[in-house]
């Protein structure tokens, strides 16, 4: 499947070295002002070639909107958009066209479909995530109308973990580091991996909060069983390249605690803690939504590796090309976009939760 969402549905298409990648965002309400500066800024945050800590492949990533927008406002019809691939170097992959790169999707794609586009991984490449970021920008325009903000940053590179979380600093950091004090050590870890022709894993922190200080997020986003907010968040994140684990709130640490240590107590003003990460019973509880996304090391490394070819013969794989030494860095921006898409979808889903909402809509007509 190539579609994410229920009421706000994103369908993507295209391959890493094809002419274009593209998307169709269906379900966007009409009347939303299109913020082209926001769209451009989101694409630049994900863009490669900005520094030594990410892939040298720098695409222009100009988003060409083909439908669903008229006179700078959404029309309520599907928003179609394209991004042209202009700097692919397919020759870098000629030597591995009959090999399975270790820990890539080559092996599974070939066995499932009997054919694979070996150029940059084809459809399995994270190049497709540029479309998710563009779609996430449209979702952010919707969320802004109701005062929801999503943001992200890096909390861990290898074993070096942030002790403080500063999302404003992350916006200025070359690696989107949340902790200024740990940033240099995290950068050094990445540089050491590069020197050794290796890669390194990392963890991104994604947060949704109210746009206004001292205000809460909407309560009740999500549904209690088969459209749980935390389940949909995890589904979206796990559907992105390189993600191996997703935590909501305390996540894995929750299994080590007693109920008396974990429970979020309440008083008349609200919750006294947020170990649940803003989700209870599959629905938002008004607190900040906290998501940690764990990325494996980039499988594309420049060391000789043992593998097999498409005929099952053992051989050596030595990669060329341009690759991220740590996919968590740009991946954090993609996950922020995915959280925006999930929340926007849940906002639209919530319109059907009470008859009063429908009466309000139709009585106005």
Curated annotation (Swiss-Prot):
Enzyme Commission number, as recorded: 4.2.3.5
Pathway given in the UniProt record: Metabolic intermediate biosynthesis; chorismate biosynthesis; chorismate from D-erythrose 4-phosphate and phosphoenolpyruvate: step 7/7
Keywords, alphabetical: Amino-acid biosynthesis, Aromatic amino acid biosynthesis, FAD, Flavoprotein, FMN, Lyase, NADP
Known cofactor(s): FMNH2
Molecular function terms, GO-annotated: chorismate synthase activity; FMN binding
Protein residues bound to NADP(+): 46
Cellular component GO terms held in the UniProt record: cytosol
The keyword Amino-acid biosynthesis belongs to this UniProt entry's keyword annotation: yes
Any GO BP annotation: aromatic amino acid family biosynthetic process
Catalyses which reaction(s): 5-O-(1-carboxyvinyl)-3-phosphoshikimate = chorismate + phosphate
Binding site for FMN: 123-125, 241-242, 281, 296-300, 322
Cofactor note: Reduced FMN (FMNH(2)).
Oligomer status and interactors: Homotetramer.
Similarity section: Belongs to the chorismate synthase family.
Role, per record: This reaction introduces a second double bond into the aromatic ring system.
Protein name: Chorismate synthase
Organism from which the protein derives: Helicobacter pylori (strain P12)
Organism phylogeny: Bacteria, Pseudomonadati, Campylobacterota, Epsilonproteobacteria, Campylobacterales
């Amino acid at each position: 499947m190539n579609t994410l969402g229920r009421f706000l549905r994103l369908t993507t298409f295209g391959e890493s070295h094809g002419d274009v990648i593209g998307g169709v965002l269906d379900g966007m309400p009409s009347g939303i002002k299109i913020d082209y500066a926001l769209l451009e800024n989101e694409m630049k945050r994900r863009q490669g070639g900005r520094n030594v800590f990410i892939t040298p492949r720098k695409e222009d990533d100009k988003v060409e909107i083909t439908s669903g927008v008229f006179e700078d406002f959404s029309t309520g019809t599907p928003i179609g958009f394209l991004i042209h691939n202009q700097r692919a170097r397919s020759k870098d992959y000629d030597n591995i066209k009959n090999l399975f790169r270790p820990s890539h999707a080559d092996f599974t794609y070939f066995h499932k479909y009997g054919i694979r586009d070996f150029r940059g991984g084809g459809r399995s490449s994270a190049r497709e995530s540029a479309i998710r970021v563009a779609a996430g920008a449209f979702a952010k325009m919707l969320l802004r109308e109701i005062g929801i903000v999503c943001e992200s940053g890096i909390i861990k590179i290898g074993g070096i973990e942030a002790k403080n979380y500063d999302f404003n600093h992350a916006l200025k950091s070359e690696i989107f580091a949340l902790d200024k004090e740990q940033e240099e050590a995290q950068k050094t870890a990445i540089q050491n991996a590069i020197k050794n022709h290796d890669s390194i894993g990392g963890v991104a922190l994604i947060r949704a909060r109210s746009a206004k200080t001292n205000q809460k997020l909407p309560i009740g986003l999500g549904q209690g069983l088969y459209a749980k907010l935390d389940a949909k968040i995890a589904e979206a994140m796990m559907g992105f390249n390189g993600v191996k684990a997703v935590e909501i709130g305390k996540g894995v640490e929750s299994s080590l605690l007693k109920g008396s240590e974990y429970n979020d107590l309440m008083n008349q003003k609200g919750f006294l803690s947020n170990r649940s990460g803003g989700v209870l019973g599959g629905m938002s509880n008004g607190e900040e939504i906290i998501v940690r996304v764990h990325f494996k090391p980039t499988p594309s490394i420049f060391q000789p590796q043992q593998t097999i070819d498409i005929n099952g013969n053992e051989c050596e794989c030595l990669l060329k090309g341009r690759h991220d030494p740590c996919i968590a860095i740009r991946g954090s921006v993609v996950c922020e976009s995915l959280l925006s898409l999930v929340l926007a979808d849940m906002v639209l889903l919530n319109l059907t939760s009470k008859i009063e909402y429908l009466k309000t809509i139709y009585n106005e007509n």
